[in-house]
Each structure stands twice: as C-alpha cells, then as structure tokens.
C-alpha cells in the first residue's frame, strides 16, 4: 500500500485562565488540550485505531518530546518534514484520557510563535492538526478509511481554518468540546484570519 501524507484536525480546547496566567507571568506560554482522538471516524472520514496512536504517541514522546524537539508549524504544512523557519511551538507532554490524546504545548518566541501567541491573547479560535505518513484501507463496516499499521506521526500544527470544520481551539467558557461542522456565516471571519497569517508568514519568508 502506498504511504502518503495524512493530515487531520481535532478540536483543541484550552482554558482562557491558562492563557491569562501565561501572559501575566511572562514565562513559557503553555496551552493544553486534545491533540488527536482514537477509534472514532473524524470529519475527513478516517479512523485512527487506538493501538496505532498509542504506539506512535509513545515513540513521539521518547524520540521527540524527551529530546525537546517535538516541533510544529503555524498554518497548513504540506511536507513530511518540519520546516524550522516556520516553527511556532513545541509539544512538551502527551498523555491519554480514554480515547483522547491530550497534550501540553509551549508556544515559542519565534516569528511564527509570536503570531500564534498574539492570536491566543486576542481570543482567536485556532485548530490543531496532526501530520503523519502512512496508508489507509477502507473499513466497510464503519464506512471510513482506517489508518494502517505503517502510520508514522510527524508533528502537530496549529491551523486557522482547519480542513475539518469545527476543529478550532477556543476557551472552555465559550463553547463545549465538540468535533463537528461549523454551520455559521462567521466562518468567513476565520478565513480572513488565515489570509492575514499567510500574508505575515510570506513577508517573514521574503
């Protein structure tokens, strides 16, 4: 089976109190929330078996988190390699809560990280996206594509306009945790945010 780049988004929920505390202390800016979910069909029609996600999260912890190089980018990377020029954050911890993979993420003082920090501080809803290489196989019973054993987790990236509608980061006091489709004309507001981010990143690269 041919391996390909697999990108999926999940709702990432963090407390506004955590953001306010990080801003007031002036120390590391940390957010915490769900990074990925096992065993359930997502909005892209894919299922991640828990044993595969557990294996990959353990490898990610040993090979990247413990060595402090679990880096991620801002926006929608389309590469199997993390581009250091676009790095915005570093995952510092992962743990399981049932079928949910929970993570703590430190926003870094890089150009992209500073943009990410200001978006959080301004209350902008953001999404989290997992990036990996692997193959999928049709699961006829679930009417979904099941991620196969050759899957390899690469990174978690923050996105402004996720490919999965509803996969946004938002304070807990604004909305309950849901993975679904946002049927709201205000979506255009978030698309405008994405355009702004792309413009800023374009200026940084040039």
Language model segments and positions:
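Polar/acidic, low-complexity leader/linker segments enriched in S/T/G and N/D
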Residues: 1-66, 180-185, 189-194, 199-202
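Residue microenvironments linked to proteolytic maturation
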Residues: 8, 71, 90-189
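A structural signal for short, hydrophobic beta-strand segments that form beta-sheets
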Residues: 9-20, 35, 81-93, 153, ...
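Short, flexible beta-strand-to-coil junctions
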Residues: 35-41, 75-78, 131-137
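A short, polar/proline- and glycine-enriched secondary-structure boundary/capping micro-motif
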Residues: 43-45, 83, 113-117
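Acidic Ser/Thr/Pro-rich low-complexity disordered segments
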Residues: 45-49, 77-85
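Short conserved beta-strand and strand-loop elements enriched in small hydrophobics
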Residues: 62, 66-82, 128
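Intrinsically disordered, low-complexity regulatory segments
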Residues: 205-206
